[in-house]
C-alpha cells in the first residue's frame, strides 16, 4: 500500500511539473494587428533586445550575469548622455521589434505580397544555417528552428518591401535619375588592395615612421596608376594590379615581411556612407576617399592596421542600374522605410497578454558572451 501511495505521489508530482512547464511557456503572447506573436518570436525579440543592451554596456559591466545586468544603467545616447535601466531598455526594444515585424507583415500583405518558393527556400536555408551556428544559444533561450524560419521569412518580406514601395512599379517609385544621383554622390565603388600595417609573420605593428614610409611607397604606386590614364575600369584595374606587384615587395620589406601569392589581388566593393564611416576611421581617410574622381587612384591609411591602395571607379561601368537598384534603394530609402514601419507598427492594435509575457521574463535569458 505504501509503495502504491508513493507511486501516486510521484506521478502527481510529475503531472504538476509538466503543468508548470506548460504554463511557463505559453504558445503565444498575443498579437499586434493581425500578427500573432508566438512565445518563440517573443523570446527571439527579447534576446535581440538584450544583445543591443549588451553592446552599450560599460567595460565594468558583466552582461553574462543577466539578473544583475538587468538592474544596471546604460548610456543609450552618447551625444545627449541619455541613460536607461537595462530591464526597461530591453522591454522597450522587445516591443519595438515586435511592432516592426507586425508592420512588415501587414504592409507586405496589404501590397499583395506573396513569397515565392525560391524566397521561402532561401529564408529557410539561412534559418538552418543560423541554427547550425548558434543553435545551442537559441535552444538555451527557448528559440527553435521554426521561430528562426518565421523570422527570416519576415526579413525577406522586409527586403521585398523596398521594391514594392520604391521600385519602378512601387507605390512611390524612385526615378532612375534620383538613383544615379545618389550613387554618384553618396556611394563609392572602389577597386583596392589591402596592405597590412604589421609583419604578417610576427604580427609586430609598424611604428609611425614605418607607416609613413609604407604610405609614401604606396602613394608612389597610386601615382603610377594615375599616370597610366586608363579610360576603362578594366584598364584602371590592370594598372592598379601592375603597380601593386611592383611596389608591394618594397612596402612589405619596411617591416621585414614578405608578400604572398595573393598580396596583389584586387578586390571590388561598393561602399555606402555608413560603410565609409565605420571602416575609414583614421583621421582624414573618409574625406580622402570622397575626394577621389572616377578613375583616380590613391593610397589611404583607413585605420591603425590597414592601408589601401585603391582606385575609385564608376559603379555603372561595373554593373547596370537595374543590378544596383536594390542596393541603392536600401541605402537611399532603407531608413525612411524602417521609420515608417516602426511608426505603423506602433499604431496597430495591441492585444498583448501581460500574464503570458511575464512567464517569459528577461531574467531567464542565457547570455554566455561576456561584454568586450
Report the location of each language-model feature.
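A solvent-exposed, charged loop/short amphipathic helix patch at secondary-structure junctions
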Residues: 60-78, 201-223, 327
Amino acid at each position: 500500500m505504501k509503495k502504491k501511495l508513493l507511486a501516486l505521489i510521484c506521478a502527481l508530482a510529475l503531472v504538476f511539473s509538466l503543468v508548470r512547464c506548460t504554463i511557463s511557456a505559453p504558445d503565444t503572447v498575443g498579437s499586434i494587428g493581425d500578427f500573432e506573436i508566438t512565445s518563440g518570436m517573443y523570446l527571439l525579440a527579447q534576446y535581440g533586445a538584450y544583445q543591443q543592451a549588451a553592446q552599450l554596456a560599460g567595460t565594468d559591466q558583466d552582461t553574462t550575469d543577466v539578473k544583475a545586468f538587468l538592474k544596471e544603467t546604460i548610456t543609450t545616447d552618447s551625444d545627449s548622455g541619455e541613460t536607461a535601466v537595462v530591464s526597461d531598455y530591453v522591454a522597450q526594444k522587445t516591443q519595438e521589434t515586435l511592432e516592426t515585424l507586425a508592420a512588415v507583415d501587414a504592409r507586405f500583405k496589404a501590397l499583395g505580397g506573396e513569397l515565392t518558393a525560391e524566397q521561402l527556400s532561401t529564408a529557410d536555408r539561412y534559418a538552418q544555417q543560423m541554427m547550425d551556428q548558434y543553435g545551442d544559444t537559441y535552444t538555451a533561450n527557448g528559440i527553435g528552428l521554426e521561430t528562426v524560419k518565421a523570422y527570416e521569412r519576415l526579413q525577406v518580406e522586409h527586403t521585398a518591401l523596398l521594391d514594392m514601395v520604391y521600385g519602378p512599379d512601387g507605390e512611390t517609385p524612385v526615378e532612375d535619375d534620383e538613383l544615379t544621383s545618389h550613387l554618384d554622390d553618396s556611394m563609392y565603388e572602389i577597386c583596392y588592395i589591402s596592405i597590412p600595417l604589421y609583419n604578417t609573420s610576427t604580427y609586430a605593428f609598424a611604428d609611425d615612421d614605418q607607416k609613413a614610409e609604407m604610405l609614401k611607397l604606396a602613394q608612389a604606386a597610386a601615382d603610377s596608376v594615375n599616370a597610366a590614364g586608363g579610360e576603362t575600369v578594366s584598364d584602371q584595374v590592370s594598372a592598379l594590379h601592375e603597380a601593386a606587384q611592383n611596389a608591394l615587395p618594397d612596402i612589405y620589406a619596411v617591416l621585414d615581411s614578405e608578400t604572398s601569392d595573393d598580396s596583389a589581388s584586387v578586390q571590388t566593393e561598393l561602399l555606402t556612407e555608413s560603410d565609409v564611416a565605420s571602416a575609414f576611421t583614421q583621421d582624414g581617410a573618409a574625406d580622402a576617399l570622397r575626394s577621389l574622381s572616377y578613375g583616380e587612384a590613391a593610397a589611404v591609411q583607413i585605420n591603425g592596421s590597414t592601408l589601401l591602395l585603391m582606385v575609385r571607379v564608376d559603379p555603372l561601368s561595373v554593373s547596370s542600374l537595374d543590378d544596383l537598384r536594390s542596393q541603392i534603394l536600401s541605402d537611399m530609402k532603407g531608413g525612411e522605410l524602417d521609420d515608417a514601419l516602426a511608426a505603423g507598427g506602433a499604431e496597430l492594435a495591441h492585444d498583448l497578454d501581460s500574464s503570458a509575457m511575464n512567464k517569459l521574463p528577461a531574467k531567464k535569458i542565457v547570455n554566455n558572451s561576456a561584454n568586450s
